[in-house]
C-alpha cells in the first residue's frame, strides 16, 4: 500500500517532530494543524514522488496519495483506449499544481493547466520551475474552458479536475471548512449539490476532446446525489461512463470518467 509512516517521515523531515505525539504505542500527527499538514505532505511528495513542492498558507492542502491514485486510475483508462502520449488539460490546478506535476513526472504527456487566482498562478509556476517540468499554466479569468484564448482550437485526450464541490449556500471563506482551510474559489462548486462547475467542465469539455478522449473528475462520497447528477450529465452529452473508487486512510473518493466514443 502506497504511503509514508510517521516514524519514517520524521527521519526525512525533522521539522515534523514538533507536531508528533503518542497515542498508545503509535505515533500521531495533529493534521488539524495546517503547518503540520503542510510539512507532512511536502515530505510525502519528496520521498514517494521526488517532487519539491511548496504550499500556500491560504490555499487548500491536497492529499498527495489520493491525487496520485486519481491520476493512476485515469491513465489506466487512457491506456486501455490506446492513448499513450496524451495531451492533457487540468482545470483548476491550484497553488500547488500537484495533479499536473504528478502527470508530467510519471506519464509521457503534454500538460496544460488552468487557474483563476493570480497569486496561486504565480505560486504554481514557481513549483513547476522548481521541479524543472514543462507545464503550460493559463489564467482562466473565471472561465471553465470556453472563452479561454490560449485553449482556442485545441483538442485534448484528457480533461482532468478535482473540481470545487460544495453547494452555492455553503460558506467557505476565512474558516475551517469541510476539513480544509482554503479560499472560496477552491471549494464552492455552485448548484444545490455543488455540481454546477462540474457541469460546465462536462458541457464545454466535450467540444475540446479528441476521439476516445476522457473527462475525469474526482468526487467525495457524499452526497451521492451529486455523483448521480454528474454521471447523468456525462451521459446526456454522449459520453460513456466508468466509475472507480479509491481509498486513502478513511477517505473514499470516486473517479467519474466520461469517455468520448
From Swiss-Prot:
Q: What SUPFAM superfamilies does the database record attribute to this sequence?
A: S-adenosyl-L-methionine-dependent methyltransferases (SSF53335)
Indicate yes or no for the key word Transferase. yes
First-level EC class: transferase
**Gene3D superfamilies, A to Z:** Vaccinia Virus protein VP39
Keywords on this record? Methyltransferase, Transferase
Q: Which CDD domains match?
A: AdoMet_MTases
Q: Biological process GO annotation list?
A: rRNA base methylation
Q: Does the keyword Methyltransferase apply?
A: yes
Q: What Enzyme Commission number(s) apply to this enzyme? A: 2.1.1.-
Highest taxon in the source lineage: Archaea
According to the record, the segments passing through the membrane are none
Q: Name one GO molecular function term.
A: 23S rRNA (adenine(1618)-N(6))-methyltransferase activity
Q: Name one Pfam family in it.
A: Methyltransf_10
UniProt family annotation = Belongs to the methyltransferase superfamily.
Q: What is this protein called?
A: Putative methyltransferase MJ0046
Organism of origin: Methanocaldococcus jannaschii (strain ATCC 43067 / DSM 2661 / JAL-1 / JCM 10045 / NBRC 100440) (Methanococcus jannaschii)
Lineage of origin: Archaea, Methanobacteriati, Methanobacteriota, Methanomada group, Methanococci
